[in-house]
């Protein structure tokens, strides 16, 4: 009889544990370096185009049907330069909603990041674009010279199914190497590693996140430019600043998906969807939660080719 009671007790304990433990699946989708490729047609070369946000949207809709609100759609900058459609709304029609804002709002982006070619358009253009977006454009290392405060929101917090996700945005600091100060007057661009160290401490203490995502408009082959600007330092930041689960890269137009270990031995996924909307970075984060605490976290990523998708998706 005692054995029967013991087995029953163990079953009750197991059932109790399973009732308090749940699995949460998150999907992160990333575009980068779209360069005005909103439509599947290259207006410069006057031919059909394999990339575009129109094709990306078909894939996004497919994934939203599977993940619902547990999907976050992120963009990593360099959207305001490239195809004539972007230039038209940059400098010709400066009254209407910018096509980049309109399309990204329609697609339901959750956050964006600044790229060097967005800065290239000048204050009047990128300020208007930022204001018209229904989601935050991030930039933790874009600093006002007047008061040393961030010009843009440094990070955004999302809560999905009991999981807190923080997305921290940064841009390559080498802007002064390429662009005259008249385009970014009143700003300076701080070092990415120093900025990440500062904000990671704040994020961990204030937000107590379950998942931290870095979205950096920078590649992964770090080098110093003009003797002072650390360019393409995404991998360096991932390795040297503990706390990131995922680092989303861009800027160098190179496809990349792989993991590195940070200085504490934790694995960090790095992913880069190249350019022009041909590829989307797709990240899966699966968490086992109990009483609001993370028991286990698995992160994986793939690059999805949008050439396989048409541009005629409709909302359900």
Question: Where are the regions a protein language model picked out?
Answer:
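Short, intrinsically disordered low-complexity segments
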Residues: 1-2, 159
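Conserved small/polar residues in nucleotide/adenosyl-binding loops
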Residues: 309-316
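Sec-dependent signal peptide recognition
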Residues: 2-10
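Hydrophobic h-region of N-terminal signal peptides that target proteins for export
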Residues: 11-18
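Acidic, metal/ion-coordinating pockets
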Residues: 20-304
């Amino acid at each position: 009889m005692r054995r029967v009671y013991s087995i029953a007790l163990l079953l009750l304990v197991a059932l109790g544990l399973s009732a308090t433990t749940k699995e949460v699946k998150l999907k992160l989708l990333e575009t980068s370096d779209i360069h005005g490729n909103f439509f599947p047609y290259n207006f410069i070369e006057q031919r059909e185009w394999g990339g575009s946000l129109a094709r990306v949207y078909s894939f996004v809709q497919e994934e939203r049907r599977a993940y619902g609100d547990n999907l976050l759609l992120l963009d990593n900058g360099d959207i305001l330069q490239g195809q004539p459609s972007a230039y038209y709304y940059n400098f010709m029609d400066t009254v209407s909603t910018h096509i980049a804002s309109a399309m990204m709002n329609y697609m339901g982006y959750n956050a964006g990041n600044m790229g060097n070619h967005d800065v290239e358009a000048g204050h009047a253009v990128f300020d208007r674009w930022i204001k018209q977006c229904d989601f935050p454009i991030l930039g933790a290392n874009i600093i006002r010279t007047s008061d040393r405060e961030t010009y843009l929101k440094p990070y955004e917090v999302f809560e999905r199914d009991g999981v807190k996700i923080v997305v921290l945005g940064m841009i390559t600091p080498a802007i002064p190497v390429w662009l005259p100060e008249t385009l970014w007057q009143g700003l300076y661009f701080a070092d990415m590693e120093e900025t990440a160290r500062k904000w990671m401490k704040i994020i961990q203490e204030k937000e107590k996140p379950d998942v931290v995502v870095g979205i950096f408009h920078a590649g992964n082959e770090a080098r110093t430019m003009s003797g002072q600007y650390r360019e393409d330092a995404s991998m360096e930041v991932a390795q040297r600043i503990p706390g990131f689960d995922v680092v989303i890269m861009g800027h160098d137009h190179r496809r990349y998906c792989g993991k590195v270990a940070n200085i504490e031995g934790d694995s960090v996924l790095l992913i880069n969807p190249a350019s022009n909307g041909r590829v989307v970075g797709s990240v899966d984060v699966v968490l086992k939660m109990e009483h609001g605490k993370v028991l286990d976290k698995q992160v994986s990523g793939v690059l999805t080719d949008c050439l396989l998708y048409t541009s005629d998706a409709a909302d359900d």
